[in-house]
Amino acid sequence: TGFGQAPYYLADEALYDYADKNYKNRKDKESRQKMAILDRMVKDGNNVGKPYVEDRVHFLAGMTPEEIATLGYDCYMRSYKGKMYPEMKALISNLEEYGFEVWILTASPEFLYQRFVASELGIPVTHVLGVKGVVKNGVMSDEIIMPIPQDDGKAQVIPTYIKAVPLIVGGNSRGDMD
């Protein structure tokens, strides 16, 4: 765990804040669809299950990668800035000093986390991997690229994208057990 996300995950807070500003109490088709996704997420209640993390991407469908990155960055700056654990920042710095290549895997939407995580930890944005959605004509679609970095998918992301055997890994939820 790189930073304290309490009482909510940043991904959820960002989506709910965005929905409050852009979709809540509106009657158009898109607003109803987006609110239905959030209702389904709340009803599911398993915020580390694959359907839940897939629905985060479904909610972001129609936004550009830049809009999603800005949404994540702004939420981080507003609610989570200063909550990166100094011990984790020191560990990452020490690993890099000794020649380790550091990667961050998250079950949150990749574009939502890349900018602020890379900025705060000083790692390349390409080393922050999350749930990937297909970008078509410059906007996120609701199609998801496998593997999903959750449950057994997190272990599959390593050979698929990193292509190296890790020397050390860490996790913060039951979705990281595999």
Annotate each PLM feature.
Residues 1-8:
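Asp-based phosphoryl-transfer active-site loop
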Residues 8-82, 86:
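A metal-dependent, Asp-based hydrolase signature
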Residues 63-103, 107-178:
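C-terminal cap/substrate-recognition subdomain and adjoining C-terminal extension
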